[in-house]
Amino acid sequence: MTVEGLTILRSPTFLTIIVLLMIVFGIAIVALLTQYV
C-alpha cells in the first residue's frame, strides 16, 4: 500500500461510500429474496 492509498482508506468520505454501497447491496439482496419467496 502506498501512502496515498492509506490516506484514501482513512478518509471519512471513502468509509461513507463503503457503508452506502453495503446498504444498497443489502437492500437489493433482500428485495431479490422476497421476490423468490
From Swiss-Prot:
Name this protein carries in UniProt: Uncharacterized protein ORF37
Gene Ontology cellular component annotations, sorted alphabetically: host cell membrane; membrane
Membrane topology, record value: Single-pass membrane protein
Membrane among keywords: yes
Originating organism: Acidianus bottle-shaped virus (isolate Italy/Pozzuoli) (ABV)
Locations listed in the record: Host membrane
Transmembrane segments: 13-33
This protein's UniProt keywords: Host membrane, Membrane, Transmembrane, Transmembrane helix
